[in-house]
A protein has these predicted regions:
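Acidic (Asp/Glu-rich) sequence patches and key acidic residues
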Residues: 1-219, 226, 232-236
């Protein structure tokens, strides 16, 4: 566990009767570990379920809800994963999901992909008991914030074609996984001459639209956010 400056999960939406934006639930933590994001998400969803009453999580969909995670800290590796049960709960309430972070002095982590791209979206599944296969992969050269949802859709589209039935349900028993690789820069290693705002490089925030979450749930897939700071070393 590592102490952080700010870490919170917020569930917000729009009142269907008044049109007023409201905060439904808010949970905070003073520390970071790889499981804390999933824990905070489920805590705010528990509070949201209480708010919705008898209608349960499904009742939150009328509020057009968004679940945001905010993180500000230093020297923290901000990788995390969401299991299929958490994805299912996000799907039930029709939520969009966003992760906004500011990490100074990100620990040095090598990407486990052979890539020079800043973002890569990858969908994999266990087609054989001992073999994880890349079903679809899309690279994004630069950290263009919030564009990754287009690439996620394209990855799912390729996965539909893989199954030949325009469905993701064929992956439900294949331990499917959607992984987002994201490069983190620091002031020290940023080499982009056109860079005028360091926040642009060292805040590779992202979002998952409700349609992406619905597709994750259809495939019974987990989600993994895998940040890194450097490419694989050249192999001699």
């Amino acid at each position: 566990m590592e102490l952080v400056d700010t870490l919170f999960a917020s569930l917000s939406g729009t009142d269907p009767f008044t049109g007023v934006d409201i905060t439904i639930a808010n949970c905070k933590s003073t520390y970071w570990d790889e499981g804390i994001v999933q824990q905070l998400i489920n805590q705010v969803l528990d509070e949201g379920e209480k708010f919705a009453g008898a209608a349960g999580l499904e009742g939150l969909s009328r509020y057009d809800v968004t679940l945001n995670i905010g993180l500000t800290s230093s020297n923290v590796w901000p990788g995390f994963s969401l299991d299929t049960a958490t994805i299912s709960r996000l799907c039930a309430c029709g939520a969009d999901f966003g992760f906004d972070l500011y990490i100074s002095d990100v620990p040095d982590v090598q990407c486990d992909l052979n890539t020079t791209n800043d973002f890569t979206v990858q969908f994999t599944a266990m087609l054989n008991p001992d073999e994880r296969v890349i079903i679809a992969k899309r690279p994004l050269k630069k950290c263009d914030a919030w564009i990754e949802d287009v690439y996620i859709f394209q990855v799912f589209k390729e996965a539909w074609q893989f199954q030949n039935d325009n469905s993701l349900r064929g992956f439900r028993d294949k331990q499917a996984e959607l992984k987002l690789y994201a490069r983190h820069y620091s002031v020290e290693n940023c080499t982009e001459e056109s860079c005028w705002d360091c926040n642009y490089c060292i805040r590779p925030r992202f979002s998952l639209s409700r349609s992406a979450i619905i597709r994750l749930n259809a495939a019974n897939a987990r989600f993994v956010y895998q940040p890194f700071t450097r490419d694989q070393r050249a192999r001699g």
